[in-house]
């Protein structure tokens, strides 16, 4: 026999358990879902993102969630101007950053039975948003499909450290259910 075959078998069995009934099951479900998107999630912070989200909502007749977007008065004006029924739109102002865009909404989406979401954000922000979103939303079995919004000529490539930092923050949230950033800032 090949040395170490027993430990390899144990590792394979543990991975099989983790991805079928264990803690990785929601991630597997999110990655394998074939359902069409059921919501459009716009990460606020840029008016072009909101406009693209509104156009998608009109074209696809999907509900729209804007997280941390423009002020409520301007957002309401955009909705009226686009002719979108306000009952199809949620304006959510709980988020303070990319991480909380997801953590403040993911349980609401899961409760509503949402399994697949179009994620609208600027093309330079999309890689970090997808890193955080895949972890946070994936932990609830929700798949994300990114919709990049052109940001030329004002695009600025985000630093890899920022993406990794937010990714670690999201992973810690998935494991503990808490945002550990305040604790880390106090203790490091």
Which residues fall in each region the model found?
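A transmembrane-helix-recognition feature enriched in membrane-embedded lipid enzymes
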Residues: 156-183
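N-terminal membrane-anchoring/stem segments of glycan-assembly enzymes
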Residues: 16, 24-25, 166-170
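A structural signal for short, hydrophobic/glycine-enriched beta-strand patches
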Residues: 21-163
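Hydrophobic membrane-insertion alpha-helices, especially the h-region
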Residues: 4-22
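Non-catalytic accessory segments flanking enzymatic or RNA/DNA-binding domains
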Residues: 5, 186-188
